Each structure stands twice: as structure tokens, then as C-alpha cells.
A protein has these predicted regions:
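Accessory nucleic-acid engagement/destabilization modules that flank
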Residues: 2-215
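Conserved RecA-like helicase motor core of SF1/SF2 enzymes
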Residues: 64, 71-89, 494, 499-507, ...
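Inter-Walker segment of RecA-like/P-loop motor cores
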Residues: 303-352
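Conserved Walker A/P-loop ATP-binding site and its immediately adjacent core
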Residues: 278-302, 311-314, 410, 478
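Interdomain hinge/linker at the junction between the two RecA-like core domains of SF2 helicases
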Residues: 407-467
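Conserved helicase motor
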Residues: 10-16, 309-322, 476-479, 494-514, ...
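Conserved strand-helix element at the start of the C-terminal RecA-like helicase core
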Residues: 280-291, 464-489, 494-496
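Walker A/P-loop
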Residues: 247-269
């Protein structure tokens, strides 16, 4: 039996017995407040998260909303008045401003009024509230704060009295928004869809996973031949392990191709995370072809239940295990996994978005490690906002950032823009993990360059390529790749790699090439590729 004076937040009818299951607004707001406080506590602002949770759905206590939710579910209501507006989010924003004042509430109001629609432009928030205050609907007198003392912890918090750097303001705004949005969705799911709720979380911690990585790397070392390259890889690994307990901050790992950068950077990140009790590792990569390769390796080490792929070419339905498949689908919403492998686009679009679906995951980046692989591929036209964002996440949200590449770009000091007015100051301190005395570029110089500056025809280049049995030829354009491929003889296997191929075909072909190169019964393997193989695709050719 639903009482007329019950303030309903969510309800559904039990399929088995027809009984109405009610979540009161008080229950929902307290549940959201507890979760949002836990999320915001990761960057030292639990009282801010709690305030957001306690206020975000106060508008559901309006008569208009209570009539609406009952009518939508076919329930009787004694209130016969007609209400034109049953929206609710703006009410919490108005109460936040009244309760906490203009100076303190500016980092709460937008999050509350936007938690269903997406963040508004900061300059529009005042006008939105003004319009609502002038409307008749807000004058019902059916909303109030039962216990204003609940918010005293927030009002008295040192941070509420401090000033946020303007360039960091919008990142803090999004981070608080993320805490509220995810807490709201999760608490609703806990009541409305308990089966999905139970599938979330329960992943291993990074401390649980570290021994698996160490055992995997030890096995590789035990089976490796005593060569100069393998000794250098071991040296890089030991240096990463030795420096991993350093304080949180910005780090770079500059290791030439073949130096074991992928596993050594992961070892540094995991040991750094464990030493600082950090939550997860997020690896951002510019190309999906490298992501598939990296994610495959990580799943081999840690199991697919602990590694989340999140990019446009990954379909969770391809995961064979049903439990892992459903967990991965849910985790793409909020990145609640110990290890995430994603694209630069997915990462930075989320960091600068106003959408609820994009921002929801952001709070799970707090107190985590961000590994930017092939960092030289960051778009120069967006470098300034990217640097500002990374500084904000490091300074305010306890993130450590590791830049990995064979050739580090300039990210510190004065960075030149497209014109003198666009010049900006880069990251102040980036600590390189590999000391100069290692001289890795000299030690790993295994390529002999022969430069011929005379022009060559397609036929001449094809003839030159055909002189070798196992050879990779990299050209500038897809047209060049096609022309050369068509001119190669058919005496053996010839393949091409370019963005003309769909991602699945590209991934399949790269795997085929790796297999063929190990197959002694297949002496001729010639590949024509565009520049997509130049950044992180793990293929070794003699020529």
C-alpha cells in the first residue's frame, strides 16, 4: 500500500506478486550522498559530494513531481490540481544557492541542475535559476531543507573558502559532476535493477595483479637468450622497478623501439600505484591497432575480467564469457576496472565534455595513473588545453602521468604555439625514468640507413623490394601502397596494411604477418604498409 504522503523517488511493480516496491526520496538522496562522498573523497572533497547527493533530487518532493510519478505508473492521487512543470533538478540548485550563498555554491549549482541534461555553460546558470524563481511552480512552498546542519561540514570545509585557479575550475566542475552523475545512476540501478548492480565491481585490485605481472616478466626473462637487446630490456625493467615508489607527479619513459617499453612502463605504473594506494591504470593510445595489440597482451597476463577495452572498434559482445561480457558492458559507463585501455580521443573528449555519459567516468580517474603511450602523437593544435588538463588532474585529483615513447616531444618549458601570442608554459617538472648514461638510443641502434635522394618509379621500387624475401616497405600514401602491392610478384606471400582496411581486417592481417614471420616453411613474406606501422605495431622484419 502506497501512502499518499510518501515522497517517492523510484518505484516498480514486482513481477512475481504484483507488490509495488518504493524507494523514498530520502532513501535515494542518502544513498547518492554516501556514494558521491566516497567518490569525491578520492580527491579530498567528501563533504562536497555529500552536499550534491543530499540536494540533487529535492525537487522530487514537489507536489507536481509526486503527482507525475504516480500518474505515470497508473497510481491514484488525491491531488487534482494540474501542473504544467514536473521537472525537478533545478530545485536543488536553488536551495544550494540559498543555503550556501553565491560564493560557495557556484561549484554545486550547475552540477545539480544539470545531472540529467549535461552541464550548462557556467554563464547561463544564473539565468536558468532566475527563470525558475520567477515561475509560479516554485512558489508552492512544498520544498525545504529538513536539517540545514547536514551541510555545515561542507560550508566549514577549508576548500569551500579557497579559490580555484580559473584554468582548473572547469575540470573541478566536471569532476564533481561525475561524482554526482555516477552515484545517482548507481543508486537508482541498485534499487531498480539489482542484477546489473551485482555484476559491477568485484574486480581485483592492482596489488592483487602485480604478482601476475612480475611472474610473467620473470618467465620471459628466464626463457630469453643472453643477447645485448635482452640485457638492455632487463636494465630498463630494473630501472622502472627501482624508481616506481617516487612521489606522485609527471614522469617520462623514453625507450627506443625494441627496449621493452610496454611491459616496463606497466611494471612502473603498477608498482607506483601499489606504493601510493592508487585505484587503477588508464592507458591511452593514439591508434586502435596498437590498442588491440596492447589489450591482448594485458588480457593474457591479467585475464579479460581485469582489463577493459574502451574504443570505437571494440564490441563487448565479442567476449565469450557471459559474466565478463556483461561486466565489460557496464564498466564502459564508468571505468570501474583496475586496468583500462582506451584511445586519446575517448580520454580527452571525456575530460572536456559536458555530457553525462562522457563525464560519468571521470571521478574514477582520480587517484589513478594515466599512461599516455606514443605521446608524440598528441595533436599540437590542442596541446595547450591538454597540458592544462593534465596539470589539473595531477595537482587536484592525485593523478600520476607517465609519458611513454621512443622520442619525447617538448611538453615542458616554453612551448611555441601557432603564433607568438599562442606560446604557453608547459609542465614544470617531468622526471625522466631512464638516466642519460644508459644511452639507450646508441645501444639500440640496430638500423642501417641508406638514403637515396634520386627519384624512383613504382616499378623500380617494386623490383628493389622483390630482391628480399622477408621485407617491409613503408610508403606515404594509400595510393602508393596499392601501386607497389600490385607490382610485386606472386612468388610467396604479399600483403598490404593501410587505413583502407577495416579495423577487424587490419588486426587480422597484423596477426597473420606475425605468424608468417615465425613460419620457416614460408620463406617469402613481403608487406607494403603506410605509416600506420610506425607507432607501436609490434612487427620485426630483417629489411
Amino acid at each position: 500500500m502506497i501512502e499518499e504522503n510518501q515522497l517517492i523517488s523510484h518505484l516498480y511493480q514486482n513481477r512475481d506478486n504484483g507488490q509495488w516496491m518504493i524507494q523514498t526520496n530520502d532513501e535515494h538522496q542518502k544513498g547518492v550522498a554516501d556514494m558521491a562522498a566516497s567518490f569525491a573523497g578520492q580527491f579530498g572533497l567528501p563533504s562536497w559530494g555529500r552536499a550534491l547527493g543530499l540536494l540533487h533530487d529535492k525537487g522530487k518532493e514537489r507536489a507536481a513531481f509526486q503527482q507525475y510519478i504516480r500518474k505515470m505508473n497508473g497510481l491514484p492521487t488525491s491531488d487534482k490540481k494540474r501542473y504544467d512543470d514536473h521537472t525537478h533538478a533545478f530545485v536543488g540548485g536553488i536551495l544550494a544557492k540559498e543555503l550556501m550563498g553565491k560564493d560557495v555554491s557556484h561549484l554545486l549549482v550547475n552540477q545539480i541542475i544539470s545531472h540529467h541534461t549535461g552541464l550548462h555553460d557556467f554563464g547561463d546558470v544564473g539565468n536558468i535559476l532566475k527563470e525558475r524563481l520567477l515561475s509560479k511552480e516554485i512558489n508552492e512552498g512544498d520544498i525545504s531543507i529538513n536539517n540545514p546542519l547536514l551541510f555545515q561540514e561542507f560550508i566549514d570545509s577549508p576548500f569551500s573558502k579557497s579559490k580555484v585557479e580559473w584554468k582548473h575550475f572547469h575540470h573541478l566542475s566536471r569532476m564533481l559532476f561525475s561524482c554526482l552523475v555516477d552515484a545517482d545512476r548507481l543508486d537508482t540501478e541498485r534499487f531498480m535493477d539489482v542484477e546489473s548492480w551485482r555484476k559491477r565491481g568485484n574486480s581485483a585490485t592492482l596489488a592483487d595483479l602485480l604478482p601476475q605481472l612480475e611472474a610473467y616478466m620473470q618467465k620471459l626473462q628466464s626463457n630469453a637468450a643472453d643477447t645485448k637487446v635482452n640485457r638492455i630490456r632487463q636494465q630498463v625493467k630494473e630501472q622502472c622497478s627501482r624508481t616506481s615508489s617516487s612521489e606522485k607527479g609527471f614522469y617520462s619513459l623514453t625507450v627506443p623501439t625494441g627496449g621493452g617499453k610496454t611491459l616496463s612502463s606497466l611494471l612502473w605504473a603498477m608498482k607506483h600505484a601499489v606504493s601510493h594506494s592508487m585505484n587503477r591504470i588508464i592507458i591511452a593510445i593514439p591508434y586502435t591497432s596498437i590498442i588491440v595489440q596492447t589489450a591482448g597482451l594485458l588480457k593474457e597476463i591479467f585475464g579479460e575480467e581485469n582489463v577493459l577495452e574502451h574504443h570505437s572498434n571494440f564490441d563487448p559482445d565479442d567476449i565469450k564469457d557471459e559474466e565478463n561480457r556483461e561486466k565489460a558492458k557496464l564498466a564502459t559507463e564508468n571505468w570501474d576496472y583496475p586496468i583500462i585501455v582506451t584511445t586519446n580521443v575517448q580520454l580527452f573528449e571525456s575530460m572536456f565534455s559536458n555530457k553525462t555519459s562522457d563525464c560519468r567516468k571521470l571521478h574514477n580517474m582520480a587517484n589513478s595513473i594515466l599512461v599516455l603511450d606514443e605521446v608524440q602523437m598528441l595533436p599540437t593544435g590542442f596541446l595547450r588545453p591538454i597540458v592544462d588538463a593534465l596539470e589539473a588532474y595531477q595537482e587536484m585529483f592525485g593523478v600520476s602521468v607517465l609519458f611513454t615513447t621512443a622520442s619525447q616531444p617538448v611538453l615542458s618549458g616554453l612551448i611555441e604555439g601557432t603564433n607568438p601570442k599562442a606560446d604557453f608554459k608547459g609542465i614544470e617538472h617531468i622526471k625522466e625514468i631512464i638516466p642519460e648514461e644508459f644511452a639507450l638510443h646508441d645501444q639500440l641502434r640496430r638500423v642501417k640507413l641508406s638514403i637515396d635522394d634520386t627519384g624512383k618509379t613504382y616499378d623500380e621500387i617494386a623490383a628493389k623490394v622483390s630482391e628480399y624475401n622477408k621485407v617491409l616497405c613503408i610508403v606515404n600514401t594509400r595510393k602508393d601502397a596499392k601501386e607497389l602491392y600490385d607490382r610485386l610478384p606472386n612468388d610467396g606471400v604479399k600483403l598490404h596494411l593501410s587505413r583502407m582496411m577495416c579495423p577487424a581486417h587490419l588486426h587480422e592481417t597484423i596477426g597473420k604477418i606475425k605468424t608468417l614471420l615465425k613460419d620457416e616453411s614460408q620463406p617469402i613474406v613481403r608487406v607494403i604498409a603506410t605509416q600506420l606501422v610506425e607507432a607501436g605495431v609490434d612487427i620485426d622484419f630483417p629489411v
